[in-house]
Amino acid sequence: MAGVAGWWADREELYRDGGAVAARAISHGGAQGDLLASFGRDSEWGPNHACAARFLRAFGSGDMDAARREMTADCVFEATGPAPDGVRHEGADAAHSVWTQMFAETTNPLFSTEEQFVAGDRAVVRWSYSWTDDQGAPGHIRGVDVIRFRDGLICEKLSYVKG
């Protein structure tokens, strides 16, 4: 570790000025954390962070097959409606079916991640979902997903909408 850190210390400014590495991240301590932070990497990044990133990218592009690959087979999805509790869907295939239908039956659907936070086996995602209605007028909702991970995959996705 010391050898790599020493080599990097001599070259960091050159790489940073050239745009080859991101701005320094916050170090979470230790030699490895310090080195990763100097590269702009979060030493706390792990399988759950990666799963969330892949899932949100897939959902944002409407690729429900890719989204399903980021869920456990027994994943639970609680939809935002109908009020007051939404509908509970059990299993990745059931969630996939709901989402595929939603994207297929909506004109110009767009799911956008506004913010995400992953800590341990939990994540919170603030999002917006927009569409065009039958008269051509735009519409949107904003909401939050509370996510739980198991073995680096989503095992629970509870969705809530501002209303």
Question: What are these model-predicted stretches?
Answer:
Residues 40-74:
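Short acidic-aromatic low-complexity motifs
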Residues 49, 54-58, 72, 92, ...:
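Secondary-structure boundary/capping motif
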Residues 37-40, 52, 80-84, 132:
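Residue-level detector of alpha-helix boundaries and kinks
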Residues 1-47, 96-163:
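A beta-strand edge to alpha-helix "cap/lid" segment located at domain peripheries
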Residues 7-8, 61, 89:
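Conserved aromatic
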Residues 52, 59, 71, 95, ...:
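Hydrophobic alpha-helical core bundles mediating ligand binding, dimerization, or RNAP-core interactions
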Residues 66-120:
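A solvent-exposed, acidic/Ser-Thr-rich amphipathic alpha-helical stretch
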